[in-house]
Amino acid sequence: MKQMVCWLTAGLLTLGGLPARAGDTVPAVPETPAAPAAPAVQETPASSAAPGFWQRSWDNVETTWRSDRYELYLPAITWHNRAFYDRDKIDEYNEHPWGLGLGRYRYDSDGNWHALYAMFFLDSHDKVEPFAGYAWQKIWRPADDVRLGAGFTVGVTARSDYSYIPFPAILPLVSVEYRRLALQATYIPGGHNNGNVLFGWLRWQL
């Protein structure tokens, strides 16, 4: 009988149903180790967005406007592409674009040329034509004091045959430069007896 009571007591103690009597030894239950804390997540600061195309364009114009460097423009040649014009038109049109212009210019950190300018010259009909705008050229330097450029100009002009109503123009630009003097030119596209004109001028850095 005494042996049966001991078995029952041991079973109840194992299940945790009864408190141990004085003198009874209860085996220690090993503690479950706590899970390690997750490492703190570091916040990554939001990177500042690069300026867009329009903002960069405006910054270039504004920086060029603040430049203290000036250059003089002297219109030199107007050439009507003979492949697109009848002979009588060639004989009729003016190809001596007398005029004058002035601009502000700068070279950026990459060595490229920027300018804001205004120019007046005689058009194909011997009428005064104004042109004002912004210009940019990628510059290559094949030798000391020699520069080659290619880029574009965007601006506003007005012509007598369009009642001097202003209209925008985007045109290509190329140049050959030596020290402070440059020969610069653009080509105006068009159709038969219209457009297809090479227009060139001298540019002198003051």
UniProtKB/Swiss-Prot annotation:
Residues 26-46 have a biased composition (Low complexity). It catalyses: a lipid A + a 1,2-diacyl-sn-glycero-3-phosphocholine = a hepta-acyl lipid A + a 2-acyl-sn-glycero-3-phosphocholine; a lipid IVA + a 1,2-diacyl-sn-glycero-3-phosphocholine = a lipid IVB + a 2-acyl-sn-glycero-3-phosphocholine; a lipid IIA + a 1,2-diacyl-sn-glycero-3-phosphocholine = a lipid IIB + a 2-acyl-sn-glycero-3-phosphocholine. Residues 26-50 are annotated as: Disordered. The keyword Transmembrane does not apply. The active site is at H80, D123, S124. It holds the Pfam family PagP. It is an enzyme of class 2 (transferase). InterPro entries: LipidA_acyl_PagP (IPR009746), OMP/PagP_b-brl (IPR011250). It is found in: Cell outer membrane. The keyword Transcription does not apply. GO terms for molecular function: acyltransferase activity. Keywords: Acyltransferase, Cell outer membrane, Membrane, Signal, Transferase. GO terms for biological process: lipid A biosynthetic process. The record marks K89 as: Role in lipopolysaccharide recognition. Residues 1-22 form the signal peptide. Gene3D superfamilies: 2.40.160.20. One of its GO terms (cellular component) is cell outer membrane. Its EC number is 2.3.1.251. Homodimer. Belongs to the lipid A palmitoyltransferase family. Transfers a fatty acid residue from the sn-1 position of a phospholipid to the N-linked hydroxyfatty acid chain on the proximal unit of lipid A or its precursors. This is Lipid A acyltransferase PagP. It comes from Laribacter hongkongensis (strain HLHK9).
